[in-house]
UniProtKB/Swiss-Prot annotation:
Chain coiled-coil ranges: none
Subcellular location: Cytoplasm
Role, per record: Catalyzes the GTP-dependent phosphorylation of 5-hydroxy-L-lysine.
Species assigned in the record: Mus musculus (Mouse)
Name of the gene: Hykk
Catalysed transformations (reactions): (5R)-5-hydroxy-L-lysine + GTP = (5R)-5-phosphooxy-L-lysine + GDP + H(+)
Protein name: Hydroxylysine kinase
Superkingdom classification of source: Eukaryota
Length: 376
């Protein structure tokens, strides 16, 4: 959902390419003739869905792509963007439903271009990925079993990334990256975006508790590379038939690796729980199913489990505070930026009203019920 830590300068950093400029980029950088192009929603970069015109000779090459233009802040770290591309290719080779990376005419995975897109000449990183079919899970009714599978997928992804090796892997140590859960205290700089209200009081309490109860235990968490943004718009599903002939939604795509950084297993499961709660009609129940799926691959330790409730609240706080702050920068993008806020504040309040003990009881009992099913 984000791609940089330099939020203070982001007001002038977001690309504002016209469709004609984007089409010209596709042709000049990648050598494709565009038949149709349409903008896609984005937090602080610019994305276009691109249809490629094919000649009379038919090929098996894809005809739909996503052109991704990074903001000027992120464009200053080309090695990090290139690393994300390498991860996408690695995971695809390992069998995960990620996009394919399109190479430029110069046989690179990214290109740095300088252009005036309306606010003076600036440099932007450009890349293109294959367009993945499917609908965001935010748009479909998700069953308990599917929540379990999503939790399992998140753990499998983190597990697979243990085998990813690259000389620049240290780039994922993004110390001041606002979207890394470890950096919840950095939210204090953005609290001015919230009016004095119960919402603000809850976030202030979350930050205080995070410093006292999570920061002191980080050394006890197991480290890994996190996707960091497995939200309900970054997981795509397609309808397929089950063995019984019923239509079921299967994961068909994993999107947006822009928030990848070193974190911890428990961070990933907390992030997934939080985002799967957003559109749920019974949000408090979600955590147990996600946790059961995740723990079928990577069981959490007692210390990690104890931190889970506060980490879910912390991710809600990150998302809600930064959405409010971003709306001040990009009021024209308010509808997209406030997706989480439509239900997020209500869910965060409910978590706090119920309290950690009551919520954990629901989550852990639900997760335990899967263990008994498996052992039968």
């Amino acid at each position: 959902m984000s791609s940089g830590a330099g939020w203070q300068s982001q007001a002038s950093a977001k690309p504002v390419f016209t469709e004609a400029q984007a089409s010209a980029l596709v042709e000049s950088v990648f050598g494709f003739k565009v038949s149709k192009i349409q903008p896609l929603p984005s937090y602080e970069d610019q994305n276009f869905r691109v249809h490629i015109a094919r000649g009379k000779e038919t090929t098996d090459d894809p005809v739909e792509y996503v052109l991704k233009i990074s903001n000027t802040e992120s464009s200053q770290t080309p090695e990090l963007i290139e690393m994300q591309n390498h991860v996408i290719m690695f995971l695809r080779a390992a069998g995960f439903p990620t996009a394919s990376v399109c190479r430029t005419k110069g046989d690179n995975t990214i290109s740095l271009i300088s252009i005036d897109s309306g606010s003076g000449v600036k440099s932007y990183l450009v890349r293109m990925l294959t367009y993945l079919p499917g609908r965001p899970i935010a748009e479909v009714a998700i069953s308990h079993q599917q929540l379990y599978e999503i939790g399992r997928l998140a753990a499998q992804l983190d597990k697979a990334l243990e085998e990813f090796h690259h000389p620049k892997l240290s780039l994922f140590h993004r110390e001041n990256f606002i979207w890394n859960l470890k950096n919840v205290p950095l939210l204090e700089k953005y609290m001015g975006a919230l009016s004095q209200s119960r919402n603000r009081e809850i976030v202030e309490q979350v930050i205080r508790m995070f410093k006292e109860e999570v920061m002191t235990k980080l050394s006890h968490f197991r480290e890994c590379i996190n996707h960091g943004d497995l939200n309900d718009h970054n997981i795509l599903v397609d309808l397929s038939k089950s063995a019984s002939g019923e239509g079921v939604h299967q994961v068909s795509g994993i999107l947006d690796f822009g928030d990848m950084s070193y974190g911890y297993y428990v961070f990933e499961v907390a992030i997934v729980i939080m985002y799967m709660m957003i559109e749920s009609t019974n949000p408090i129940q979600v955590g147990g199913h996600i946790l059961a799926g995740f723990e079928s691959v990577i069981p959490l330790t007692a210390v990690e489990r104890q931190a889970l409730f506060l980490l879910v609240c912390s991710r809600f706080s990150q998302s809600l505070v930064m959405a409010a702050y971003s709306c001040q920068l990009y009021p024209e993008n308010k509808e997209y930026l406030m997706i989480t806020a439509k239900t997020g504040w209500k869910h965060l309040q409910q978590l706090f009203d119920m309290g950690q003990k009551a919520v954990e009881e629901i989550w852990f009992e639900t997760a335990k019920s899967y263990e008994s099913e498996i052992s039968m």
